[in-house]
């Protein structure tokens, strides 16, 4: 069909999730649907199993702290050090529980992955996996602390849309004007979730 060799993301290219074309459906929470070739780096990164992501981080993370330095939540003054979570998870180091618990502060924006990490690792996926695992086990970080003072370097580390577009490799998909096309669509079957 029209989607052969393509993959669909529900949401944006950084925080969106892959759509299971066989089982997912459009609901009132469906966001924009983005269609990319299956070979696109965004799709490859989202499809990479967490086990492989952790192995790559274990082998290639140089502990440069760029993921933490570029983290918008860190720059706003929250005590989140993404590099510590990545190192702890990828090396199974449980010496400091705060390295894991601070992942609760991660909003999953992906700046650490797309802009921060020069090793092309995926700190976002690791942080979100740790955050999800802790939640499933009922472990919650106390998030009743207000952020500390906004870091002075924040202004110089803001990321423009243009830089994100280039780093994501989607410049060719960005258009100043999008022509609307209306087509009649008559599906063979319709499933209604109850």
Mark where each language-model region is.
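Redox cofactor-anchoring modules in respiratory/redox and cofactor-processing assemblies
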Residues: 1-179, 191
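Charged/polar low-complexity intrinsically disordered segments, enriched in acidic residues
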Residues: 183-193
């Amino acid at each position: 069909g029209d989607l052969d060799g393509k993959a669909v993301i529900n949401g944006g290219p950084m925080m969106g999730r892959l759509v299971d074309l066989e089982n997912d459906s459009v609901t009132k929470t469906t966001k924009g649907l983005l269609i990319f070739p299956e070979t696109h780096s965004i799709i490859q990164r989202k499809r990479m199993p967490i086990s492989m992501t952790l192995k790559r981080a274990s082998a290639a993370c140089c502990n440069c702290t760029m993921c933490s330095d570029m983290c918008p939540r860190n720059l706003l003054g929250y005590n989140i050090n993404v590099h510590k979570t990545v190192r702890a998870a990828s090396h199974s180091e449980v010496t400091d529980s705060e390295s894991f618990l601070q992942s609760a502060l991660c909003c999953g924006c992906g700046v650490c992955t797309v802009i921060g990490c020069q090793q092309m690792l995926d700190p976002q996926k690791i942080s979100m996996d740790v955050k999800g695992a802790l939640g499933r086990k009922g472990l919650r970080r106390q998030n009743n602390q207000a952020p500390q003072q906004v870091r002075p370097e924040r202004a110089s580390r803001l990321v423009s849309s243009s830089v994100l577009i280039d780093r994501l490799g989607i410049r060719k998909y960005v258009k100043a004007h999008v022509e609307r096309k209306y087509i009649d669509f008559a599906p063979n079957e319709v499933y209604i979730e109850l």
